[in-house]
UniProtKB/Swiss-Prot annotation:
Residues holding Mg(2+) 1: 98, 538
Residues forming the catalytic site: 54, 100 (proton acceptor)
InterPro entries linked to this entry: PRibForGlyAmidine_synth_PurL, PurL_linker, PurM-like_C_dom, PurM-like_C_sf, PurM-like_N, PurM-like_N_sf
SS bond list: none
Highest rank taxon of the organism: Bacteria
Residues annotated to bind substrate: 99-102, 121, 245, 317-319, 540
Protein name as catalogued: Phosphoribosylformylglycinamidine synthase subunit PurL
Class in the EC hierarchy, top level: ligase
Record field: catalytic activity: N(2)-formyl-N(1)-(5-phospho-beta-D-ribosyl)glycinamide + L-glutamine + ATP + H2O = 2-formamido-N(1)-(5-O-phospho-beta-D-ribosyl)acetamidine + L-glutamate + ADP + phosphate + H(+)
Keywords: ATP-binding, Cytoplasm, Ligase, Magnesium, Metal-binding, Nucleotide-binding, Purine biosynthesis
Cellular component, GO annotation: cytoplasm
Organism: Geobacillus sp. (strain WCH70)
Amino acid sequence: MSLLLEPTPTMIKEEKLYREMGLTDEEFAMIEKILGRLPNYTETGIFSVMWSEHCSYKNSKPVLKKFPTEGKHVLQGPGEGAGIVDIGDGLAVAFKIESHNHPSAIEPYQGAATGVGGIIRDVFSMGARPIALLNSLRFGELTSPRVKYLFEHVVAGIAGYGNCVGIPTVGGEVQFDAAYEGNPLVNAMCVGIIRHEDIQRGIASGVGNTVMYVGAKTGRDGIHGATFASEELTEQSEAKRPAVQVGDPFMEKLLLEACLEVVKSDALVGIQDMGAAGLTSSSAEMASKGGFGIEMNLDLVPQREAGMTPYEMMLSESQERMLLVVKQGREQEIYELFAKYGLEAKAIGKVTDDKMLRLYFRGEVVAEIPVDALAKDAPVYHKPSKEPAYYREFQAMEPYVPAVSNYEETLLSLLAQPTIASKEWVYQQYDYMVRTNTVVAPGSDAAVLRIRGTNKALAMTTDCNSRYIYLDPETGGKIAVAEAARNIVCSGAKPLAITDCLNFGNPEKPEIFWQLEKAVDGMSEVCRVLGTPVISGNVSLYNETNGEAIYPTPVIGMVGLVEDIRHITTQAFQQAGDLIYVIGEAKQEFGGSELQKLLEGRIFGKAPEIDLATEAKRQQELLTAIQAGVVASAHDIAEGGFAVALAECVMSTNGLGAKVTVDGDITSQLFSETQSRFIVSVKKENQEKFEKLVEAKLIGEVTNDGTLLVERASGEVVIQLSVEQMRSVWKGAIPCLLKSKA
C-alpha cells in the first residue's frame, strides 16, 4: 500500500479501522488525547503493536507484580532481553523463555525456527554467549494427522535453526493433550554465560549519539506479528500466514559473533533485538528506558523489498536484526567491526532530548509520538476474575479411585503414552553435543553443561504439568515450580532462579483471568520458599481456537548451579548391589494423573496436594547427600508415579534391573502422583551416611539381571518385566504413532 492509498486520520476514526489493528474505541480516544490530534495510519499501527498484550502486558502486568524478582545473586531481573544471575568467579548466567505459539500453529517449521532465533538474540543482546537451548512443546493427541504434521515440522524447525547456529538443544519437554489440538504451544528457552563486566542493556542515552541498524534487511514478513499473537486463532488465521517470519540461522550466527565482539567496545551505549514489533519496539523501549527520544530517517533503513511504506518498515518483524546506540564520532569502528563479519551496520537516526519518537520519510515527518506513551505508560487493565463452575465441581468430587487388575499391563500402557514415552525421536534430531560442554544429555531429569575454565556446571530444565493447573491453578502453579526444582536437585545442582512462559487463554474471559491469577499466586509462593526469584519471562495469552482455551500452561524454565562437577548425578542406576530408596509416602492421589487419563480418557477431580515445608526439606536433604558424595543416582517421581519413575531408572542403564518391595494399596504405591517424592540409589558402603542425612525408606536393590521385579512383602509378584520389553514399548511409542495412519 503506497502512502497515497493509506487511509486518512479521519477515515481511520470514522470507519473504526483501528479495530482491525486490535485497538479498542477507548484506546483510540486515549491516543487522540495523547497526541492532541488524530493519529495517521503509521502512528495508529505503532500504537496498536506497542499496546498489544504481546508488547505491553496490559492485561497481565498487575498479576506479574506478584512475582519475587530480587535476590542476592540477581544481577538483572525482568525488563531486559534476559535475566542474569551471578554464579561466582566473575561469571553469570543469562536466560529467558519465550513463546512462538501462534506462528507455529500456522506455519510450524518457520514459526518454531524463528522462535529459537528470537530467544537467542534476547540472550546475546545482553552480552552473553548462548550455550544451550531448551524447549517446552504441547500438541493435541498424536493420533490426529494435523497434530502429527505440526509436531514433525515444529521439531524440524527447532532442529534446523539450532543446529545451524551451532548452539546445542539439550533439554525440554513434550506433552500431548486434546486441549492443544488447534493451538500448539512452542516455548523456547536460551541459556548464556557472561562475564560481569560485559553485561549490556537495551538503553538509548546521550543526545546526538547514533542509532544504528545491523543485520538482515527489512521485508514485509511478520507485519503485525505482535497483534496476531494477541488474538485468538480462528478459521481465518490461516490467511495470516504472511504474518509468520522466515529465519536465516547463518545470518544469526554472524550477528551473534559480531554482537559479542561489539559489546566489548566502549563505543557501544545500548543494544536491543528487533523482536516483536521490530523497529518500533526496539527504538521506543530503548528511548523510554533511557529517558531520551529517538529520531530516525526511514529512507536509510536497509530494505529487501521495493516501495515499503513507513508503516510496513516500522511493523515488520523480519528476523536477525538488532538496533544499537553508538557514541557519536565512533561510528566508523563499529561499521568496520560488522563488515569483518560480512554484515552492514547503518546509521539511521540519533538520540534526542525531547522523549519523542520522530520518524522522517522522504523529507517529511510521518510519525511523532511520546516514547513513554508507547512503553512504560501503555494502558494497564485490571480484568474481572471469576472462579469457573468446573473448578467448584471438581473440588466437590470424591477422590477418584482407579480400578487396576493387571499391574504389568498398566505399566506398559503408561510407558506407551506419548507424554511419558521416550522423546528420543525428538532429541535425536537436535545436535546436543555441539561445543562439547554437554555432560548430561537429554533424557535425564535435567540437562547439565560444564562451565569451561571452572570446576562448575549448570543444570537446566523446563517443566509444567498443565493438567494439574487446569484442575487447580494455585496448587498446579506450586507443583510446576517445585517439580522444576526437583529436577535440578536430582542433577546435583542448587536451584538459582526461574524464567516463565505464561501460556493461557483469552484474559477477557473472567474464568481464564482467574486461572492466570491463581497460577501466579501458587508459583510466587514456591519461588519465595525455595529462594528462586523470577528473573525473566513472557506472557502468551489468547491461546484459543474457535473459543476453546488450552489448559493453563505456565511453563517454568529453571537453572541451577553444580558447585563441583563431581556432584553431577543422573536418574540411571549405576551398579548391581546398590540400595534403592524412596523419599516420600504415596497417597491415593489420581486427579489429573496419567493413569486417570489412560483409564477414563479425561481428567477430573482434585490435583495432588503439595506441602511446601516438606518439599523444601526433602530437596535440601537430597542435595546435601548428593554433595556429600553418598548418592549414586536420583530421579523425581512425576507423571505415571513410582512405577514409571522406577522403569526410567532401569531403562537408562545397560543391562541392569531392580528388585523392590511395596506394600499397602498397590495401585497408589505404583501409580499415584503424590508430590515431593524421589527414587534414589546408594552404594552399600554409603548406607549409614545416607540414612543420617536423608529421611528415606529402603525398598530394594539394583540387580544385574535386566528385569524389573516388584513384590509384596509376602513375596507375591506384582510386576515382573524385562527391561528390554519395557524399553521397546517406551522407545517405540512415538515413532509408531507417527507412522500409523489415523
